[in-house]
Amino acid sequence: MVVDPYQKREAKRYKNPIPSREYISSCLRTSQDLISQKNLEKKFGINNQESKKALRRRLRAMERDGQVIYTSNRCYVAPESLKIVKGKVIGHRDGYGFLRTETLKEDLWLSSEQMKSCIHGDIILAHIVETHGKRRSSARFLKLLQPNNILIVGRYYIDDKIKFVIPDDTRFNFKIFIFSAIKDDISIGSIVSVKLKQHPIRNSRVQGFIVEILGKEMGTNLAIEIALRTHLIPSLWSKEVKKQVYEISRKINQYDFKNRTDLRHFPFFTIDDEDARDFDDAVFCKRKANPEEGWILWVAIADVSCYVQPNTPLDKAALERGTSVYFPSLVIPMLPEKISTDLCSLKPNVERLCLICEMSLSKQGELISYKHYEGIICSHGRFTYNEIFKIWNGDIFLRSKYKKFLKDIENLSCLQNIFNKDNISKKGIYFENIEPKFVLDSNLRIKSIYQNIRNDAHKFIESCMILANVASARFVEKYKYPVLFRNHDRPKKDNVVSLRLFLNELGFTLLGGDSPESVHYSNLLKNVSDRPEYEMIQTVLLRSMTQAVYSPDNRGHFGLSLSSYVHFTSPIRRYPDLILHRVIKYLLFKDKNTSKSNYNFYSAHLYSTGEIKKIGAHCSITERRADEANRDVIDWLKCDFMYKKIGCILNGVISNVTTFGFFVRLNQFFIDGLVHINSLNDDYYYFDSLGLKLIGKSTKNTYCLGDALKVKVISVNLNEKKIELSLYKSS
């Protein structure tokens, strides 16, 4: 007889435990027939009325969550048996949508007819409708499990006395009819936030009411406000959080020194961008007593866990945010400024509590051993990447200005020269991405754009942080306790096949068989680095990759070519790093068998697998939403900037090719605009998905990734964040 594997867990939770959800689902999946509750009771040996009622409640809860289906003949069945899946609706601007599930590799297609019963962001149950040939399978809406209850931002209009809002997010492809407003004299065209009162039901209107009037004239600040509401990003602190922060002392007392290693005499430096807002890491290195034996590298990370303790209002607020959100003109921090820009900011000449990762490196820069401990440091200097790079390259003024630090700065340079040759951070896939930087004017509009060039100082700090993350992963992995790993899965097989076909068209080969390793991708990039196709190949390689996620299951990091990886170095701005610090502290104190009275026990914490899994899924989502919110604001800023360039003739390179045209990246501004296929009137063009190009049916003229073109800016739609271009041909 099979025993419920979660029996002990249920016994801890309930006085009279019944079979777990997982066990019930397993029994239904393996059953050949539909099963009634009565037969389930017999199968599980449930006889008393109290347990029968508990089982009924559990089955209803499972039905509500889409884990079981209750049929018309009063039986239960697993959704998989009926090809029924639970998923999240992803809307599309053209009215159709997709259903994203946790179990299927590919999203299911939702027709515009099916989308009349749901909206973007809904969690639904749907029936899989198989299709033949190359088309993807579709989904038929069955039941709304969890409606998307977010506030929808859009513009307010009146037409023939009918009030409605058109959503700013085009994935909501419908009008919201307003039956009541917070006031009657709202100006037409005002940007408002709306709460839905009635979800779409076939052939019925979506209804809602206005919650807030955000403004009328668009600007950077309003674009940020819209992004925050669209992506449900909290930006205010509760009274409880403010109270807790107020009570935190700014002074380090003698108790804080207990069991900490005093490193204040070590010349730690912070090295960041000119416009950096967080200073949560500092580095110091020196040669070993015998230089032939290598180096010792110290990475000091602000001890956020000392101030943000588990399950406090501050901790809950940080978890809800998951990450800091960086807009061009503003930061929405994960932690209040008293912590993020003061107590945990490693400012020069100020004592700060840190968690230290001390690493022993070989002469070749390889990680030999490591140790973690609580420390206290005093940063000796705040440098920028450009300053360090210039000092390394002999800048007379800076070398004179920082004369007393030259020996230690030169040590950093020596270690970077070793890193440049070969070390753990060089074994992964390295993409040379173009990173545009915006200079804003007094109105927070783009004044100018320049390319941010990564120099050796950037690469050095990146290598130091990767090493500290690897050392931390190796440390926690030894104990087998639940932690959040940073997983980057290998590319999906379909993506590898498509990539190989594309490369074959160009005459290049990706080695590694069915499952190429990171080294094969890296070698390919090195082999084509001096070829004109480099940018194009790098773009396609990058698009073939999966997204990195947080999970308690260690699956390794494909991009970095590492068997295990965690995030340790940014607890000010990333919640997973804060969790890792707490677990590391727990393991340190557990090893020392130290009594609670001898250290700050409340900054250490161990999590259950269930807690870690839930937090990992949440933090993966908050990371994506932060990226999307930032992208929304940057796209608006770009469109606002390009609005003044309508009519201009500019040079660019094709950055993406689709069925409806191709995008051109403007060389001068690093901004993409669309050349629509309908504007190519010299021929009928079709999309070649294999070679990622458009081909003229008669002329055989082609437009493919990397082609250099001259284009004209035709129009800019600020509301839809679209830039339209056309090919420019001189007369």
UniProtKB/Swiss-Prot annotation:
Catalytic activity field: Exonucleolytic cleavage in the 3'- to 5'-direction to yield nucleoside 5'-phosphates
Pfam families, A to Z: CSD2, OB_RNB, RNB, S1
One GO cellular component term: cytosol
Annotated compartments: Cytoplasm
Gene Ontology molecular-function annotations: exoribonuclease II activity; RNA binding
Domain of life, source organism: Bacteria
Protein task: 3'-5' exoribonuclease that releases 5'-nucleoside monophosphates and is involved in maturation of structured RNAs.
Subunit structure, interactors included: Monomer.
Protein name as it appears in the record: Ribonuclease R
Organism: Buchnera aphidicola subsp. Acyrthosiphon pisum (strain APS) (Acyrthosiphon pisum symbiotic bacterium)
